[in-house]
Amino acid sequence: MTDNLPEVREAQEWFRSETRRVAPITLDVMWDHFLSRHWSQLSPDFPLQEFVCYAREQVMTILPDSPPRFINLNNYLWSEQWLVRYRDMDFIQNVLNGMASRRPRLDALRDSWYDLDAHYDALETRFWQFYPRMMAQASHKAL
């Protein structure tokens, strides 16, 4: 949903040539980091932990009809509290390394961590530029 936003396309250009191919994946993880980190500002009336419980309940209703790999992934993500833990950059690095380990074609995800680190402040600025606009569009079903 975010890949075609001008701020996101600009951020993809900040990745080095050897990691640019995985920039969309890395940026999706990074946007989740900022979402988790700034949740209390973005949703002051719905604490993150309550949202996680609510979201889990919603997903659990579709799990019985889902493929086994999706079920296993969800069981792991929920039990490990990923969205809550995304606020920690060390966890983000572990997530990228884990993805790279599971998918050899995505090995560049390991090194994309350095692009995030080098451009952290600029990425956070871009997040604040597009996220409120994206949420307004979503609330009007204009995405």
UniProtKB/Swiss-Prot annotation:
Pfam families: ACP_PD. It catalyses: holo-[ACP] + H2O = apo-[ACP] + (R)-4'-phosphopantetheine + H(+). InterPro entries: ACP_PD. Keywords: Fatty acid biosynthesis, Fatty acid metabolism, Hydrolase, Lipid biosynthesis, Lipid metabolism. The keyword Nucleotide-binding does not apply. One of its GO terms (molecular function) is [acyl-carrier-protein] phosphodiesterase activity. Its EC number is 3.1.4.14. It is an enzyme of class 3 (hydrolase). One of its GO terms (biological process) is fatty acid biosynthetic process. Belongs to the AcpH family. Converts holo-ACP to apo-ACP by hydrolytic cleavage of the phosphopantetheine prosthetic group from ACP. This is Putative acyl carrier protein phosphodiesterase. It comes from Shigella flexneri.
